[in-house]
C-alpha cells in the first residue's frame, strides 16, 4: 500500500472539514481531483447519501465496436470496486451487456418473453421510461453507405440503437477512445472509408461527423477518452453528474475542453510528460534507445509531451504505476487523433521534436515546466560547461 504524503494528509483533513453540500462546482472538482475516487467516496460517504436523498439514478451502458477494455478497466478500479461505488452513489445499473444476465430471445424474427429475461425488450422499456444517464463504450460504424450495418445486434444496427438510447437520455457520456472519436476502429486502412467508424460526438477531431450529428440529435456529450479510460475518470465524472456538481448543459462550457473532455482530468495546460517519473532523465538529456532501460523514453516513441492527461499524478493500478513507469512509452491514447496521430507508436518522431524543439538540444533549452524548475538549473549548468 502506498503511504499518503504529508501534503496529501493535510489536504484530506482540509477537505474533510468542508461542507460537501455547500461545495460549488470548482471546489467539488478540486476535491475529486486531489482525493481520487476511493478517498472521495470514503470521505463524503454520509454527505453523499444525504445529498442523494435515496433518489435512484438509472444508468444504461451500451457497447458498440470495441474490446470492452474500458469496462474491464472500471471493474479493476480497486477499492471501492465498481459495485460499491455504484451503491454509494445509489445508481441502478439498469443495463450493461457485459455485466447483465439477460439475453436477446427471438422467435421467427419477433422478440419473445419478458424484460426480465430478454435484454432487447428491457432496453426498449428503459428507452420509453427515459430519465437515465447513457454511457456509450465503443465506436459506431456508419458504413456501408450510411446504413450502419457493419454492426447489427439482433435485427437492429448499433447506429439505430444509439439513436434510440440518446433520444431520452438526461446525460450522455462516451467512454474510451472508440466511443469518443472512433479510436482503433477508425484508424487509416484500406477499408476505413467503407466501414466509416465514428465516435458519439466526433470522428477524430471533426465534430461535424459525430454519430449524433449524423442522426440529427443535438445533445451535449462528455468524452472520457483513453485506451482504456482510467476508472477514476469514469467514476468521478459520473459522480459529478449524478450529484449535480456538473449541471448539464449549463456547466459544460467551463468544465470541458474543445473536444468534450473534462479539463480536470485532461488539462489543456498540462501533459503527462510534466509529471513523468522519468522526467529527471529528460532534463539531463539522457534517453533510452532500447527497451528495458530506466531513462527517458522519447527516442522509443514516447508521446507524453503531447498527451493532455493527469496519468503522472493519478497513476494506474491502484495509484502505483503508469505506462512510462512500467517501461512502456506513452502512446497518447487520450488524443482525438489516436491512433493515427501517434503512429508509428514506438519510433521517435524525428520531424516533430518536443514542443517543436530538436531532441538533441531540448534538455539545454528547457521547455515548459522545466524552464521553471529543474530545467533552469540544467540550462545554467550547461551554460557553464558543467
From Swiss-Prot:
Residues 1-51 form the signal peptide. Composed of a large subunit (VhtA), a small subunit (VhtG) and a cytochrome subunit (VhtC). SUPFAM superfamilies: HydA/Nqo6-like (SSF56770). This is F420 non-reducing hydrogenase II small subunit. Keywords: 3Fe-4S, 4Fe-4S, Cell membrane, Iron, Iron-sulfur, Membrane, Metal-binding, Methanogenesis, Oxidoreductase, Signal. It is a peripheral membrane protein. One of its GO terms (biological process) is methanogenesis. It is found in: Cell membrane. It catalyses: methanophenazine + H2 = dihydromethanophenazine. One of its GO terms (cellular component) is [Ni-Fe] hydrogenase complex. Gene3D superfamilies: Cytochrome-c3 hydrogenase, C-terminal domain, NADH:ubiquinone oxidoreductase-like, 20kDa subunit. Its cofactor is [4Fe-4S] cluster; [3Fe-4S] cluster. Belongs to the [NiFe]/[NiFeSe] hydrogenase small subunit family. Predicted to be exported by the Tat system. The position of the signal peptide cleavage has not been experimentally proven. [3Fe-4S] cluster binds at residues 311, 330, 333. Its EC number is 1.12.98.3. [4Fe-4S] cluster 2 binds at residues 273, 276, 296, 302. Disulfide bonds: none annotated. It comes from Methanosarcina mazei (strain ATCC BAA-159 / DSM 3647 / Goe1 / Go1 / JCM 11833 / OCM 88). Part of the F420 non-reducing hydrogenase II complex that catalyzes the reduction of methanophenazine to dihydromethanophenazine. Induction: Expressed in methanol-grown cells. [4Fe-4S] cluster 1 binds at residues 67, 70, 178, 227. Binds 2 [4Fe-4S] clusters. Its main location: membrane. One of its GO terms (molecular function) is electron transfer activity.
Amino acid at each position: 500500500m502506498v503511504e499518503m504524503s504529508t501534503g496529501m494528509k493535510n489536504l484530506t483533513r482540509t477537505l474533510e472539514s468542508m461542507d460537501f453540500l455547500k461545495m460549488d462546482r470548482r471546489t467539488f472538482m478540486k476535491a475529486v481531483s486531489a482525493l481520487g475516487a476511493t478517498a472521495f467516496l470514503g470521505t463524503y460517504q454520509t454527505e453523499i447519501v444525504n445529498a442523494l436523498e435515496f433518489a435512484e439514478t438509472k444508468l444504461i451502458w451500451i457497447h458498440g465496436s470495441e474490446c470492452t477494455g474500458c469496462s474491464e478497466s472500471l471493474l479493476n478500479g480497486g477499492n471501492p470496486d465498481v459495485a460499491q461505488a455504484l451503491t454509494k452513489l445509489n445508481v441502478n445499473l439498469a443495463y450493461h451487456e457485459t455485466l447483465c444476465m439477460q439475453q436477446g430471445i427471438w422467435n421467427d424474427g419477433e422478440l419473445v418473453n419478458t424484460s426480465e429475461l430478454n435484454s432487447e425488450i428491457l432496453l426498449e422499456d428503459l428507452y420509453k421510461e427515459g430519465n437515465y444517464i447513457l454511457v456509450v463504450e465503443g465506436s459506431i460504424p456508419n458504413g456501408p453507405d450510411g446504413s450502419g450495418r457493419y454492426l447489427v445486434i439482433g435485427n437492429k444496427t448499433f447506429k439505430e440503437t444509439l439513436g434510440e438510447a440518446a433520444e431520452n437520455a438526461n446525460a450522455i457520456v462516451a467512454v474510451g477512445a472508440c466511443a469518443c472519436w472512433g479510436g482503433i476502429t477508425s484508424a487509416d486502412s484500406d477499408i476505413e472509408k467503407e466501414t466509416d467508424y465514428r465516435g458519439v460526438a466526433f470522428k477524430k477531431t471533426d465534430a461535424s461527423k459525430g454519430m449524433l450529428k449524423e442522426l440529427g440529435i443535438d445533445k451535449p456529450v462528455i468524452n472520457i477518452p483513453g485506451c482504456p479510460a482510467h476508472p477514476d475518470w469514469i467514476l468521478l465524472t459520473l459522480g459529478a453528474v449524478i450529484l449535480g456538481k456538473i449541471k448539464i448543459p449549463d456547466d459544460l462550457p467551463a468544465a470541458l475542453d474543445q473536444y468534450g473532455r473534462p479539463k480536470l482530468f485532461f488539462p489543456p495546460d498540462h501533459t503527462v510528460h510534466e509529471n513523468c517519473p522519468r522526467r529527471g532523465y529528460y532534463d539531463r538529456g539522457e534517453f533510452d534507445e532500447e527497451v528495458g532501460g530506466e531513462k527517458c523514453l522519447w527516442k522509443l516513441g514516447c508521446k507524453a509531451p503531447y498527451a493532455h492527461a493527469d496519468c503522472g499524478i493519478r497513476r494506474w493500478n491502484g495509484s502505483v504505476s503508469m505506462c512510462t513507469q512500467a517501461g512502456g512509452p506513452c502512446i497518447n491514447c487520450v488524443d482525438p487523433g489516436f491512433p493515427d496521430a501517434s503512429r508509428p507508436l514506438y519510433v521517435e518522431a524525428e520531424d516533430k521534436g518536443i514542443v517543436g524543439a530538436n531532441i538533441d538540444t531540448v534538455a539545454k533549452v528547457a521547455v515548459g515546466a522545466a524552464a521553471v524548475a529543474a530545467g533552469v538549473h540544467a540550462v545554467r549548468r550547461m551554460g557553464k560547461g558543467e
